[in-house]
């Protein structure tokens, strides 16, 4: 008998539903919210309301594209956190009601675990090469920057993480200072492709171990811009490509430096990247360069699996279903939770 999992993701501003059957993805529907662009960031109340409007049609569309009826579902997996509490509650509440009405198990999924296990999403007709355990995963997004030792689907250890800002958060804030709009990551990525990554130098942290820090870079970028604009008020407009390229290169250097140390320290050559910032062209190129230079076997997700999506929640739910790792109706949402 087939195992069919419906995954639901609503941790921030993307409403998503996906269906996985026996480990293979049948559908992955994502509804993004453009309303936040005018505010320069996600407005939690608006995000929650949009999730309420979107969740039913998104789930309906996911089932339709998968060619699956709700009665065929084996379980419903949902994101329990971390994320915006209001947004999470929409997905958690819907998942509970939906599963309860069908009398099928509920599976709570850690959003961060989902990003890591996105590398195990399989699609019909594709190579679907997957990492072998143990492997390292650089999880980097607007809210997280972590180096994770992945020993099994259900056994992960954080080796290092940011002690202040996340990499994506720093990029977004620097983009905002430049007046480039929201979200800043894709804009910086686009401009950086046309700029000189060695045009400007910004400070890098000097902290021991495998932890990250990006607050110093953010401050260095801000103060440098302030000084340059005293001499040329239009400095940003005249040099935005080089600024973006230099900022991106600095962030990538910081990320890869600690990742190299982790790979050497733990003697692991299978290395993956996950999270929203893994869509960044500069970071992807750095991974390919490191693969060639250090003999790494690298795993870079499809662009559709870098940002928040329910496919990663569904595949994690699929693995937990094999272990009968279900949750109760009392399972709460958590705005803050680690791996």
UniProtKB/Swiss-Prot annotation:
- Cofactor section: Fe(2+)
Co-factor remark? Binds 1 Fe(2+) ion per subunit.
Residues annotated as binding Fe cation: 111, 115, 308
Residues the entry annotates as binding substrate: 139-143, 172, 185, 189, 280
Query: Per its UniProt record, what CDD domains does this chain match?
Result: ASKHA_NBD_TsaD_bac
Q: Which UniProt keywords apply?
A: Acyltransferase, Cytoplasm, Iron, Metal-binding, Transferase, tRNA processing
Q: What are its GO cellular component terms?
A: cytoplasm
Establish whether keyword Transferase is in the entry: yes
Q: Which GO terms describe its biological process?
A: tRNA threonylcarbamoyladenosine modification
State whether keyword Signal applies. no
Location in the cell: Cytoplasm
Q: What does this chain do?
A: Required for the formation of a threonylcarbamoyl group on adenosine at position 37 (t(6)A37) in tRNAs that read codons beginning with adenine. Is involved in the transfer of the threonylcarbamoyl moiety of threonylcarbamoyl-AMP (TC-AMP) to the N6 group of A37, together with TsaE and TsaB. TsaD likely plays a direct catalytic role in this reaction.
- What is the protein name stated in its UniProt record? tRNA N6-adenosine threonylcarbamoyltransferase
The species this protein belongs to is: Bacteroides fragilis (strain ATCC 25285 / DSM 2151 / CCUG 4856 / JCM 11019 / LMG 10263 / NCTC 9343 / Onslow / VPI 2553 / EN-2)
Gene coding for it: tsaD
């Amino acid at each position: 008998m087939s195992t069919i999992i419906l995954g639901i993701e609503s941790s921030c501003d993307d409403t998503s539903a996906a269906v996985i059957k026996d480990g293979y993805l049948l559908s992955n529907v994502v509804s993004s919210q453009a309303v936040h662009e005018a505010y320069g960031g996600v407005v939690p109340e608006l995000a929650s309301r949009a999730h309420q409007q979107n969740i039913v049609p998104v789930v309906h569309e996911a089932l339709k594209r998968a060619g699956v009826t709700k009665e065929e579902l084996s379980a419903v997996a949902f994101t329990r956190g971390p994320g915006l509490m209001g947004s999470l509650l929409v997905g958690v509440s819907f998942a509970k009601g939906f599963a309860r009405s069908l009398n099928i198990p509920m599976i709570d999924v850690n959003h961060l675990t989902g990003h890591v296990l996105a590398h195990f999403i399989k699609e019909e007709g594709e190579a679907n090469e997957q990492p072998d355990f143990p492997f390292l995963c650089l999880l980097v997004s607007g809210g997280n920057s972590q180096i994770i030792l992945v020993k099994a689907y259900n056994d992960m250890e954080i080796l290092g993480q940011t002690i202040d800002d996340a990499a994506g958060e720093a990029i977004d804030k620097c983009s905002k200072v430049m007046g480039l709009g929201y979200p800043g990551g894709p804009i910086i990525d686009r401009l950086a492709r046309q700029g000189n990554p060695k045009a400007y130098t910004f400070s890098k942290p000097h902290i021991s171990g495998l932890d990250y820090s990006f607050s110093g870079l953010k401050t260095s970028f801000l103060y440098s811009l302030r000084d340059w604009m005293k001499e040329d008020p239009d400095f940003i407009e005249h040099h935005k490509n080089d600024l973006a390229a230099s900022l991106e290169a600095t962030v990538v250097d910081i990320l890869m430096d600690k990742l190299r140390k982790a790979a050497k320290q733990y003697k692991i050559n299978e290395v993956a990247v996950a999270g929203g910032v893994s869509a960044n062209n500069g970071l992807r190129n750095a991974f390919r360069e490191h693969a060639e230079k250090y003999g790494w076997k690298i795993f870079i997700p499809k662009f559709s699996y870098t940002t928040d999506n329910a496919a990663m929640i569904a595949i994690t739910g699929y693995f937990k279903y094999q272990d009968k790792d279900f949750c109760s109706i009392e399972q709460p949402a958590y705005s803050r939770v680690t791996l």
